């Protein structure tokens, strides 16, 4: 579907004059991020860029048109140009782009930069006519691209207007060369050479200066003047006299009177016909005009100098100069308006022969030939859907009237899938209901296959809307209706059946359904659905207590992502999310944190509401490390997101766990009570997220001293967990039950429950749940271990837990949290200097991190502040504590810790 001419730089520059004053300015271009040619139309931006780069080996060229405002099209063309510039060093990124397997342009560009690390040669990529881009997402992504691209790459932009690419910042930092219309406008010397090259009689300096002043050095106007002199066999003096009133606003009139009317009618008609096309080759022109001499005509007109640019490549691609193309379009609409629809229709048919349905449907829409639009959609609609042309498809479908749209059930279904694929779930049911009603009005009999596809789609919407029973009913109905060959909908329906059984706690049914879904999806190469099935299987296995098996299955998910270039799709974040949850439960916090941050990067360009899970995990990790200030920032994000959006209980339960653990660490019982007052209480607890929500409720009651309510919640939890064989949740519930018993001073019961939990942990490995309440259960674990009440495996686990609890407590001290500082400043033996020159909370944190061996940069990253801010904190604490250097700071911190008994 890609047009070769958009990726080829203009050729045949032998008629262009050499411009040393501009070329001299460009000699230092390799040391700059951006070279910007900015001027109004017709100043030779493209020609100048092409001339400058003509002898450079590593150049990629991208000629932009207004259809490139679609991010998918833009990035595909850009990466093809980059590959040409870097000897195809970005091939993996190109595959990702072609398959639309990226969550945002930023994340895709990160892959590009990683691949470009191996290419060290000077290279250039040209974005020609960038002013046609009006998509803010593309602008923002290109700002990111310019900021982070490797030093050996220079981006060259031609544009009529100042592009919103952060040029002010680049200019201030001296990272941009800007060639404006002042530089591109011909000076007198260049004007003289220009006309001497084209006019037999030549030109003297005075006349050249007059001409240059007359048109303000505008190259296109000078070209028009030269053309007039050539074709009318007039001297330059006569030509100048005839255009004495020429100005930019009169360009169309000038072109008509002095150029266009001089052509024979056949040539004029040919040009107006061809101007329907933005880019063209002889095959397209032949299909459009039925002229067998199409290539000869084009080359003849190119020699004639009528602003037709030949483009590099073997397929004889050409395009009009933008200005001349606009003029021809103006003339076409004025002179042959009755042919407009036929021309666009013929152009659509011509592009179909070039196997470019995207271009074809664009012209079909302009021709308002709805029958042709329907024909293209019926033949290529699903192919375009799979290739990500969603905006184009929706625009075309919206142009159809009701009769046409609903006379073709295939298009009705495509319209509904477009809504689903763009996350407009609430519209899908309405669209399908409307289609059903309209089909009945037209006596269109809907076969069971269509109804099966509709039910599969509605089943997916129902499960997304937390209506599992309805989703199951629809999915099973869809499977009974669908033909075996309709694999996409059968896979979706099978997946929904598995997911519903998972949600209802029927894990033994859910797992085989998801295994079947994965098998079908792999067989038919529907890899997104295969990944989804792997994720569901992993969650089911975790719930069943087979956590190591789930972990290994996740590895197969990561392999699938790598093999099929799925790194940038949102499902990758889902996999990282459940991997982080397992790692947190195994107390592998650094790895869990890495997964959470990777997830945020993948979702960078999605709605902030999708970041809730990542922030929940990051908060939990910070709490586990005792970094409560850092956790507080994540908690603020969580609370803001939960106020702004409505979430599934799976999301809110995870977020609420982090909130409760944070408030527990802060001793904020008021916040816990406020949460409990409004907490959702699911009717059942037959799946992992309902179990988590009820466990949050039990934990809240414990923190508030409401032990009877906590007991009631835990009894309900364990009853449901045993009923549905939720092994891992049973394990987690036992830990909370032990905490409740300890709070109620029932030590024997607490130890019994802990022992049972430790036995189960041999299978699940769930140690993180013990560590969240280390202060409560640490002593109990020690007593269990000393009394030899545990088996060897359980004793080893208990000893490791005690070690981790001790390490976490020390970590909290090293990070100098509020409790530690309060005890320190009130200690009778604390140095007087600490009392009289109290450090701020942040300065204490910085001192603790210095003691832990963190560099200034690492401290800034840890506290999420600027490096200059850290330097200020260090300077202040050095001054307050009379410290000269980092070595003395470490000694001071160590002395304070020893004073406190660490």
Swiss-Prot record:
Q: Which GO terms describe its molecular function?
A: ATP binding; DNA binding; DNA-binding transcription factor activity
Q: What is this protein called?
A: HTH-type transcriptional regulator MalT
What InterPro entries does the annotation carry? P-loop_NTPase, Sig_transdc_resp-reg_C-effctor, TPR-like_helical_dom_sf, TPR_MalT, Tscrpt_reg_HTH_MalT, Tscrpt_reg_LuxR_C, WH-like_DNA-bd_sf
One GO biological process term? positive regulation of carbohydrate metabolic process
Family statement drawn from the similarity comment of this UniProt entry: Belongs to the MalT family.
Residues annotated to bind ATP? 39-46
* Regulation (activators, inhibitors): Activated by ATP and maltotriose, which are both required for DNA binding.
Keyword Nucleotide-binding attached: yes
Residue ranges of domain HTH luxR-type in the record: 832-897
Q: What does this protein do?
A: Positively regulates the transcription of the maltose regulon whose gene products are responsible for uptake and catabolism of malto-oligosaccharides. Specifically binds to the promoter region of its target genes, recognizing a short DNA motif called the MalT box.
